[in-house]
C-alpha cells in the first residue's frame, strides 16, 4: 500500500462540484475515482484539499489516496488523462509519505476570482461580470479589512450554530490583470461559499452600493443585516494549496 498525491486542474462548469454525490450526478471527485478504480482494479477513495462548489474551477486541486497498485505513476497519470474528459487534467502524480493527507496536511489555500466589467461571450465560463466600471481603490480598502482572524459566518452558507466559524486570512487584494479585475485571497481555511460572498460584497462597494464602514462592521461582528448574495461560481478558481 502506498499513498499518492495528485495535482489536478479542472473546468468546473459542467460538474456539480468536487465532492462525490450519489447516483449519476457528475462531480470531479466521482469522475476521477471511477476511472482510477477502473485502471487499478481496486476501490479508490480520494481526499481533496478543497471542496469546490458547483461551477467552481481549479488551477491546483490536490488529492491524496491509498493504492495497492504498483503501476508507475507517470503511466497512471497518462492513463487517467486518456480517459478523463478534457475538462479535467492530472498535472502531476507523486508518491508521498503515508501521513500525508491532502486536506488535513494543507496549511494554506489560495483562491482567485476573475471579474469582467462588461459582458464577454468568450470569457463567461471563467469570469463573473460586474456590468459596471469598478472603483478598485474602494475594493482594495475593503479587502484589507478581511486580513486577520475573524468569524466569517456573515459571508458563508454555514449554519449560524456551526462550531468552526473562524478563519485566518493571510492576504487579500484586488488588482487589474489583462483587462480583468482579480481578487486573490489566502487563508488557513474557508467557510462554504465564503469567497463568493466576500466578492459580491466588495463588488457592491466598488459600485458605490455598500459603504466600506458597513462591510467592516460585518467582518468584525460576524453578523449582517445586509442582504448577502454569492457572486457567480464561474469566476472562482481554487488557485494554490500550500503545505
Curated annotation (Swiss-Prot):
One of its GO terms (molecular function) is tRNA pseudouridine(38-40) synthase activity. SUPFAM superfamilies: Pseudouridine synthase. Coiled coil: none annotated. GO terms for biological process: tRNA pseudouridine synthesis. The keyword tRNA processing applies. It is an enzyme of class 5 (isomerase). Its EC number is 5.4.99.12. Substrate binds at residue 111. It comes from the Bacteria. Gene3D superfamilies: Pseudouridine synthase I, catalytic domain, C-terminal subdomain, Pseudouridine synthase I, catalytic domain, N-terminal subdomain. InterPro entries: PsdUridine_synth_cat_dom_sf (IPR020103), PsdUridine_synth_TruA (IPR001406), PsdUridine_synth_TruA_a/b_dom (IPR020097), PsdUridine_synth_TruA_C (IPR020095), TruA/RsuA/RluB/E/F_N (IPR020094). Disulfide bonds: none annotated. It catalyses: uridine(38/39/40) in tRNA = pseudouridine(38/39/40) in tRNA. The keyword tRNA processing applies. NCBIfam families: hisT_truA (TIGR00071). Homodimer. This is tRNA pseudouridine synthase A.
